[in-house]
């Protein structure tokens, strides 16, 4: 098998093995990974806790963004065959007539500062039940009965559950997928495209403007995430991919 064919098969495997669905295999692997997760509750010093939190998440954020960059390079180079490109378009919920240029507008990185800030806010700096036991640092929901974990304070009229993941890697991967294909974040992707087209830096504070639909508090959420980025000087990580 030549390298080009292997590359296409590898991407197809990646698509079908990724956590597209919330109800993935979850058991011994999840338990083992939970043991390896730092106990942020026990770190009483706020500065130390934040440092531990960023140190835990940042390597995986860099790894996942690097995978996206590699995929973008494969698309640009023309190394992917028609069936692989078709599978990618389906995976990202795009029309089959989508051009490679349009595909690249969807498949792109998310700044590390934005990921870290959202994870900090959504998981209470890694101390939430969903972060500790289910590797969900981003408050990601699913809506099919049994797809995840039922929140303790869910209202009677609500049907959502919290997505559970077997590892931090799968949690971040799914978060990036959500940002890149969910219609709720179309504005974020347009901001990112504008930055790309004009050769401007892709920053967390800039892309946060497209997160008004991420939480029920609307634009207050945008301002909160931007404040976390600025206060913790997270912009320093945006160019370390």
Give the ranges of each region predicted by the language model:
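Short, Lys/Arg-rich N-terminal segment immediately upstream of the first membrane anchor
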Residues: 1-4, 42
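Catalytic cores of secreted/periplasmic lytic hydrolases that degrade extracellular macromolecules
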Residues: 21-117, 121, 125-241
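N-terminal signal peptide c-region/cleavage motif recognized by signal peptidases
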Residues: 17-19
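Sec-dependent signal peptide recognition
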Residues: 5-12
């Amino acid at each position: 098998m030549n390298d080009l064919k292997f590359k296409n098969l590898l991407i197809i495997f990646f698509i079908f093995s990724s956590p597209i669905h919330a109800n993935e295999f979850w058991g011994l692997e999840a338990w083992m990974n939970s043991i390896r997760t730092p106990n942020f509750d026990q770190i009483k010093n706020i500065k130390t806790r934040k440092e531990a939190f960023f140190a835990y998440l940042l390597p995986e954020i860099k790894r996942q963004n690097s995978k996206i960059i590699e995929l973008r390079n494969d698309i640009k180079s023309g190394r992917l065959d028609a069936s692989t490109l078709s599978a990618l378009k389906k995976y990202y919920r795009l029309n089959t007539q989508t051009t490679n240029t349009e595909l690249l507008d969807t498949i792109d990185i998310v700044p590390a500062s934005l990921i870290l800030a959202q994870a900090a806010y959504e998981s209470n700096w890694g101390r939430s039940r969903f972060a500790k036991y289910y590797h969900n640092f981003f408050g990601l929901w699913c809506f099919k009965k049994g797809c995840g974990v039922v929140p303790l304070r869910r209202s009677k009229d609500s049907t959502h559950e919290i997505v559970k993941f077997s590892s931090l890697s799968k949690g971040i991967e799914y978060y990036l997928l959500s940002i890149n294909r969910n219609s709720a974040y179309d504005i974020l992707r347009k901001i990112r495209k504008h930055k790309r087209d004009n050769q401007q830096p892709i920053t967390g504070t800039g892309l946060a403007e497209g997160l008004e639909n991420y939480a029920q508090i609307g634009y207050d959420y945008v301002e909160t995430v931007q404040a976390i980025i600025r206060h913790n000087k997270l912009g320093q990580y945006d160019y370390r991919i």
